[in-house]
Amino acid sequence: MSPVEVSNVFDTILVLDFGSQYSHLITRRLREFNVYAEMLPCTQKIADLHWKPKGVILSGGPYSVYEKDAPHVDKAIFDLGVPILGICYGLQEIAWINNTEVGRGEKREYGPATLRVEDKSCPLFANVDHSTVWMSHHDKVHNLPAGFKITATSENSPFCGIANEDKQIYGIQFHPEVTHSTQGKTLLRNFAVDICKASQSWNMENFIDTEINRIRELVGPDAEVIGAVSGGVDSTVAAKLMDRAIGDRFHAIMVDNGVLRLNEAATVKKTLGEGLGINLTVVDASDEFLDKLKGVTDPEKKRKIIGNTFIHVFEREAAKIQPKNGKEIEFLLQGTLYPDVIESISFKGPSQTIKTHHNVGGLLENMKLKLIEPLRELFKDEVRELGELLGISHELVWRHPFPGPGIAIRVLGEVTREQVAIARKADYIYIEEIRKAGLYNNISQAFACLLPVKSVGVMGDQRTYEQVIALRAIETTDFMTADWYPFEHSFLKKVASRIVNEVDGVARVTYDITSKPPATVEWE
């Protein structure tokens, strides 16, 4: 659904993003209590907004409102007649627009601080007591804007909370969206539900019915849809939703590129085709992919080769599909999620390319297809909930993500059948042990990498000189930041022993304890 379509069905809070690293969390927190929220850049012109929000939240940001090139909101938001909440930079923006001095504070406030609620009658602070909040600012408001009152303070922020209740404009200097603010979620609920009067109707049960009806209306009674599936949760949920909407008029294609997990193609065929009843074609193109990867060591080149080859294979197989009604395929299904949308529309704009994302965007232009993205408004946790409601198994719904380029970017250096086989078997053993230990659902993603270095070892009385496996496991809520998972040493010892003894060509196993940032989740 587009933002306009969603807002026509669900009450929506508009989050205007000034570039804070926490902006996406505002949207997540609101949805956690069933209020839909849409994030747009702070430069959004209200005249171009074709829907009316129930309220507006101004996010934090890394700028100073008094700087020459500082971003400022379209003042027309104050004419919408809806409640407004400014967070951190957002509070300073409200003060600045109201002709109040904002400048550099004598002391910075980064990290936890004690919030003192000074006006308990303020609806924003209903059921919010003196508590710990998360600060991240150096600038501060020097005077109280005309028509506003102080609602909260901290040791270093005399205007930690301000409000003009007649105009329903509120500002807070701290970040309620982060979990470090112990009562932040209550405050956001107060704003969205009690002040903005947004209905708490956003849930996956309602989404299913709404989205299926939208798909049927968009596709019509005759058109056919094609889409790629990988066996991952996103493509599987999107495919099942499409199957529920139009049945066999949806054609799923699974391409075996030779760098999938162990027995992946057979598993997908059984799970999606036989288990979920999805109209599925499985294509073995492993030789084609691996031949093109010969001699390639640069990770970006690997990604592009796999992406381009995928498009070629997909187009070729799509041409073989003959719709029962004799008409051409008109639509392409893509499992885009909301974090992808956020990355493209955030105030910072498209960030510097760290890695090329493997997707099927090139198919649209080449095949002249119309795009359907039924999951584009959803976060990962919402997709998982949706999957279970659609009858997809818990094991599949909670499966760890797997990159589009597959094991090709987990074999550092040249990708050969032999190297893929080593990495694949090590990964299988690692995941098997994680499942046996009951840790799989505690970990967001785990995998084994084959490093392009050799290490001396001893097996029996023989000297060995073989390769190194690096294990990686992370915990995260959104994959934008991540911490390494703290396995017990005994667990790592067991996994390392199995890999060295059961995987030919491996002499040493290491464990990656780098967080994101500075590292990315994948090694390539």
Swiss-Prot record:
Pathway: Purine metabolism; GMP biosynthesis; GMP from XMP (L-Gln route): step 1/1. InterPro entries: Class_I_gatase-like, GATASE, GMP_synth_C, GMP_synth_GATase, GMP_synthase, GMPS_ATP_PPase_dom, NAD/GMP_synthase, Rossmann-like_a/b/a_fold. Residues 202-399 form the GMPS ATP-PPase domain. Its cofactor is Mg(2+). It catalyses: XMP + L-glutamine + ATP + H2O = GMP + L-glutamate + AMP + diphosphate + 2 H(+). It holds the Pfam family NAD_synthase. HAMAP family: GMP_synthase. This is GMP synthase [glutamine-hydrolyzing]. It comes from Kluyveromyces lactis (strain ATCC 8585 / CBS 2359 / DSM 70799 / NBRC 1267 / NRRL Y-1140 / WM37) (Yeast).
